[in-house]
Amino acid sequence: ALFSILRGLKKLGKMGQAFVNCEIYKKC
């Protein structure tokens, strides 16, 4: 269970990074 939670957090982190890149650096 913990492993899947960590994997989900990593996926969320990538999505968050993409969102930051899009919003701040205009890299969409």
Swiss-Prot record:
<dbReference type="GO" id="GO:0050829">
    <property type="term" value="P:defense response to Gram-negative bacterium"/>
</dbReference>
<keyword id="KW-1015">Disulfide bond</keyword>
<keyword id="KW-0878">Amphibian defense peptide</keyword>
<dbReference type="InterPro" id="IPR012521">
    <property type="entry name" value="Antimicrobial_frog_2"/>
</dbReference>
<keyword id="KW-0044">Antibiotic</keyword>
<dbReference type="GO" id="GO:0005576">
    <property type="term" value="C:extracellular region"/>
</dbReference>
<keyword id="KW-0929">Antimicrobial</keyword>
<comment type="function">
    <text>Antimicrobial activity against Gram-negative bacterium E.coli.</text>
</comment>
<dbReference type="Pfam" id="PF08023">
    <property type="entry name" value="Antimicrobial_2"/>
</dbReference>
<comment type="similarity">
    <text>Belongs to the frog skin active peptide (FSAP) family. Brevinin subfamily.</text>
</comment>
<protein>
    <recommendedName>
        <fullName>Palustrin-1a</fullName>
    </recommendedName>
</protein>
<keyword id="KW-0964">Secreted</keyword>
<feature type="disulfide bond">
    <location>
        <begin position="22"/>
        <end position="28"/>
    </location>
</feature>
